[in-house]
Amino acid sequence: MDVEAIGRVVEQANDAGTELIRFLYVDHGGVVRGKATSRSTLERRMASGIGLTVAMQAMNMLDELQPVDGMGPVGEVRIVPDPDSYVNLPFSPGAAAMMSDLIDLDGQPWAACPRSFLRSAMAEAARDGLVLQAAYEPEFLLARRETGPDGDRLVPVDESLCFSTTGFALAHDFAIDFVRAIAAQGMAVELYHPELGHGQQEMSIRHGPALAAADRQVWYRETARGVAWRHGLWASLAPKPLPDQAGNGAHCHFSAWTATSDSDPGGRGDPPRPETHNAFYDAGDRYGLSPLAYHFIGGVL
């Protein structure tokens, strides 16, 4: 890893008085996992990564190890952080985090690393002169967790109607803290409204290159839960947390843009400059779609 990048992260951690820095990754079940290093060992751990048993990528969402060849309790990879993804966590004072790649002991991206797979897909698109843009449209339930004779249950913070001002008012304190926490991590909430389900929230983050968009979705999920807990609440992004209410969507919007010399196929910059071209658009087509767009849709289907 670049020595200058490591030094920049160490300086950020020192300036913020950060005590623990989380090296995070996402497993095949969508669970955000990781390990943390202290500030005193941050420089060394960034260079070496942190060891992780290969079995973790065979765990299901209940931490039950599944029988997958090559993913047993013997063998490890390294959790290697991306220094460009460093953020201080406003909902966990004294902590910071970085998104990480899973690297094998030969220093190569591990085949079972989702983030490395996305990097590879973006590089393949870049070879065809394309930059992939993406954004998520996540929804989540904001609720109180109550314990009763039949076990824990989630009770929504409101029973308001979709888009109603009552919903805005009842979730106001949480919403403001969420927006500020997102901004503190270098992102911005573009739209917000109470959704169809009781207690259901929708806050949308601006699109960006695919890798950045995926990382932002992780920060979004972590922030929703972290801010909720500090309010004594529970934020659930599960597809159907309440059987009698609308489920939570997590729509992923994506498009392809022609790359220019100052585009950012590496994945961490702003959206394409105005002079780049939306490769999915064709003004002469009945539906405004280019041949590439039709082929892309066909590939997805």
Predicted regions and their residues:
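ATP/Mg2+-dependent ligation/transfer catalytic cores
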Residues: 1-191, 233
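Metal-centered catalytic cores of metalloenzymes
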Residues: 3, 190-197, 210-213
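A glycine-rich phosphate-binding loop feature that marks nucleotide/adenosyl-phosphate handling sites
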Residues: 26, 138-143, 195-200, 240-249
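Short, hydrophobic beta-strand segments
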Residues: 98-104, 201-207, 254
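Active-site-proximal beta-alpha loop/turn segments in soluble metabolic enzymes
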Residues: 155-166, 198-213, 242-247, 278
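Glycine-rich anion/phosphate-binding loop at the beta-strand->alpha-helix junction
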Residues: 212-301
